[in-house]
Amino acid sequence: ECNIGDICVVHGDCSECKCSDGRAAKCDREHGEPPHCSCSHR
């Protein structure tokens, strides 16, 4: 199970993480360390 905010390296590219809108999460390497799975992408 992958959740938003999980560390990217644990879940690869975060494609298993589902956002509330149904899209897959992306790995956010720009906001905070370590890189984490995020839904804030546009």
Swiss-Prot record:
PTM comment text: Contains four disulfide bonds.
Alphabetical UniProt keywords: Disulfide bond
UniProt keyword annotation of Disulfide bond present: yes
Domain of life: Eukaryota
Protein role: Inhibitor of shell growth.
Descriptive protein name: Perlinhibin-related protein
The species this protein was found in: Haliotis laevigata
Organism lineage string: Eukaryota, Metazoa, Spiralia, Lophotrochozoa, Mollusca
